[in-house]
């Protein structure tokens, strides 16, 4: 156990109570409120390496990693030092910055699909822009997204997936007009036949297909054998674009993302998280002929006050430099496999149905027999059991994503001893569930 003993959250509770009077739900992003797992959220005070400390002094082994960016560990000294130097020159220019060229070259060299790139300030912004670009390039309005794949909170992506009504493009949030999502078609993840049917029903109208090539926002779901290849074939057949949302998986699954790992090259890619080294960032890129449509080179407008700011560029450059060191992804795969395999083995030994897996430094598991191929399968997980497991692990000093439907992340800062401690905690908690 790595928390203070006994486990107390008095200060966290006080701060969150005050926050609820100041911000909707007391948070700046919904999942942080612990609504999915119950109880009060933990308020962090600081993070370092693979650990987080809350305001009550409890220390946690962190498997959220600020939702993915902290692949080198929190507050890596080389990133911090680079930021200190950059800040002396100013926090934002609102003008061209030489650091943009450096990070752009690194991204282009790494990601197979990207010949040109545009930096923005978040993954949501990147996906908003890439959707506009898909439509501008093809002259078509409709897109296909997959049930359970998250592409940010922009109106056109907020479509409830998985039912016949949802396929008609009805909005999944108040305030989103039906007309906004009318051209957003949905299909179950890992279902090529459903994708073929949508193209057949909408001949010459679909601009393209966008997806998380490995799903991290319905829990952790990998593509079936041939699924990504099948999407590439279908989109080429219909002169439509294939877009990989690699905001979460880019530079995490491999240096070149899922597209490098699985050998399937899309037309466009969105990025975020890791390429900002923990600072707000996003990017989209792809074939030169498509990207030349983006203003000011072309007529498709997109802009941003803080886009390409020197701090995000600096943190991103240093993070990618660290990731290029030898054996980086081999180590991530090694420790994450040991963690994932261990969790599943402990679940089986303690009598709990569970399934899951990992790829590189990304993992997840469900309290269900499985296998899980899509969001409908994921929803079979025992959410009450997960809530109890989450709370138990929290009290044992292990910080997991406060939702069954979020992937977990390891970092280069996690040690074999951290994995040992995590598995020991899991055995204690699962034995008592």
From Swiss-Prot:
Question: Does Ribosomal protein show up as a keyword for this record?
Answer: no
Q: Which family does it belong to?
A: Belongs to the class-III pyridoxal-phosphate-dependent aminotransferase family. HemL subfamily.
Q: Please write the reaction equations for the catalytic activity of this protein.
A: (S)-4-amino-5-oxopentanoate = 5-aminolevulinate
Q: Which GO terms describe its cellular component?
A: cytoplasm
State whether it acts alone or in a complex, and with which partners, per the record: Homodimer.
Q: What is this protein called?
A: Glutamate-1-semialdehyde 2,1-aminomutase
Keyword terms = Chlorophyll biosynthesis, Cytoplasm, Isomerase, Porphyrin biosynthesis, Pyridoxal phosphate
Which GO annotations describe the biological process of this protein? chlorophyll biosynthetic process; protoporphyrinogen IX biosynthetic process
Gene coding for it: hemL
Pathway assigned to this chain's UniProt record: Porphyrin-containing compound metabolism; protoporphyrin-IX biosynthesis; 5-aminolevulinate from L-glutamyl-tRNA(Glu): step 2/2; Porphyrin-containing compound metabolism; chlorophyll biosynthesis
Task: Give the enzyme's main class according to its UniProt record, as a single word.
Answer: isomerase
Q: Which coenzymes or cofactors are required?
A: pyridoxal 5'-phosphate
InterPro entries named in the record: 4pyrrol_synth_GluAld_NH2Trfase, Aminotrans_3, Aminotrans_3_PPA_site, PyrdxlP-dep_Trfase, PyrdxlP-dep_Trfase_major, PyrdxlP-dep_Trfase_small
Organism of derivation: Synechococcus sp. (strain ATCC 27144 / PCC 6301 / SAUG 1402/1)
Q: Which residues carry this modification: N6-(pyridoxal phosphate)lysine?
A: 273
